[in-house]
Amino acid sequence: MINMIILVVFALIGLVVGYSAISIKLSKAKEQAETILLKAEQDAVNLRSQAEHDADHLRVTAERESKAQRKELLLEAKEKARKYREDIEEEFKSERQELKQMENRLTERATSLDRKDENLSSKELALEKKEQSLADKSKHLNEREENVTQLEAEKQAELERIGQMTIAEAREVILTETENNLTHEIATRIKDAEAQIKDTVDKKAKNLLAQAMQRLSGDYVTEQTVTTVHLPDDNMKGRIIGREGRNIRTLESLTGIDVIIDDTPEVVVLSGFDPIRREIARMTLEALIKDGRIHPARIEELVEKSRKEMDNRIREYGEEAAYEIGAMNLHPDLIKIMGRLQFRTSYGQNVLRHSVEVGKLAGIMASELGENVALARRAGFLHDMGKAIDKEVEGSHVEIGTEFARKYKEHPVVVNAIASHHGDVEPESVIAVIVAAADALSSARPGARNESVENYVKRLRDLEEIASSFDGVQTSFALQAGREIRIMVHPNKISDDEVTILSHKIREQIEKNLDYPGNIKVTVIREFRAVDYAK
């Protein structure tokens, strides 16, 4: 019994040990299977990567070969096209040569015929001249024959009269005749001398002007009425326009310049006849683009800042021009006035550059004539300064310039040169005449001026002057090439009810005094602001 139990126990132990061994083998088999599976997955990933790499390599190789083939075909096609073009051009060249030869032959024949025609005409004219000459000689001989007969009769009568005279009377007659003959001879010689002097003076004057023009060289560009501003990208156009167009309206109202935004990439066009306004608008717009803050309040701030910068630039332009011409010790106000001429045109010609050119020409001519060169250059430089303020002060630019020259104690020769350069008064010195001649040279040379541009600018200025002539008007701007006039009024002087009446009055004055194509839109703007500060 005990043996049976022992056998059973050993059997159970054997079963437990066998189960444990089997479990261990199963675990090892499972681990081996997992290892094999991981290795298989890694191999699969490696194989996939290798396959993708091989596929990419094959694709790149195929694309390279395809590009090489395309390039080769393209080069071959270009070579064929080049050869075909050369063949065609060679054919055209030969045909053109044949046509040129035919044209030359026809031209030679035509020239030969013209020459023969001219020879015949010349011979005919020569015969006519000979006939006319013979007729004139015959007529002259007849007249001389008549004169001789008349003189013989007069001499006979004179001899009869002298035969009845006393010695004193005969002496008086001889002296009278001698005096008459000498008077006639003297008058003839004086007349010949005057003609010779005039001819000599004309030649010397022409030589002097030619020398002055040859010794002066200047670069000029015709002034335009538009300015372009380049943008960093086209998205900036929307920011410049602003919500419902408020930014662009503010900029146009403050500067009086048309801001044109079209399909041209990365460009905004500023259009206006007044160069100072246009330059202020350009400076403001560039500052806004650089700053990035574009809204009405910022626009107003930068417009005011640009106006102050413009004053400094005007003074710098005047100083540079005065230094270039050698006009020393100019009054600061005169320097600023001359600087404003940089933004003033006359028939498309920049007035400041014109003034510098006149000063240089006057200096050259003065040196040739032995006059004061510095004074001539100064007078030529200042001769048109009245144009800088002719819109602000009553009178012509000559009258205004003369008045300011006297006000700032300029030399009397300079004052007279300014007053006389358009012939309003008589020149009192050689320098005044030189300045007038230099002004005519600078302005009348071909290409210096453009009358159509000046007429356009004058029409817009007249339009603004009509609007600004009414009481209560603060500023007025001609926009859209003169198709619109925008008027800003003082809110304390013009009420809302009077705005409509004012627009009608301005419209009536425009219709009465101006000739213009189409319609002109009259816009009157009354803006009232109340500002206070919280402390």
Curated annotation (Swiss-Prot):
Coiled-coil portions: none
Main location: membrane
Gene3D superfamilies: Hypothetical protein af1432, K Homology domain, type 1
The HD domain, residue ranges: 351-444
UniProt membrane topology term: Single-pass membrane protein
Matching PROSITE patterns: HD, KH_TYPE_1
Ranges where the record places region Disordered: 103-149
One GO term (biological process): mRNA catabolic process
Record keyword Cell membrane present: yes
Entries under InterPro entries matching the protein: HD/PDEase_dom, HD_domain, HDIG_dom, KH_dom, KH_dom_type_1, KH_dom_type_1_sf, Ribonuclease_Y, RNase_Y_N
Sequence ranges assigned to domain KH in this UniProt record: 225-285
Entry's transmembrane regions: 4-24
UniProt subcellular location: Cell membrane
Gene Ontology MF term list: RNA binding; RNA endonuclease activity
Keywords: Cell membrane, Endonuclease, Hydrolase, Membrane, Nuclease, RNA-binding, Transmembrane, Transmembrane helix
CC annotations in GO: plasma membrane
EC number: 3.1.-.-
Family the UniProt entry places it in: Belongs to the RNase Y family.
Cross-referenced PANTHER family: RIBONUCLEASE Y
HAMAP family from the UniProt entry: RNase_Y (MF_00335)
Role played: Endoribonuclease that initiates mRNA decay.
Protein name: Ribonuclease Y
Organism annotation: Streptococcus thermophilus (strain ATCC BAA-250 / LMG 18311)
Organism classification: Bacteria, Bacillati, Bacillota, Bacilli, Lactobacillales
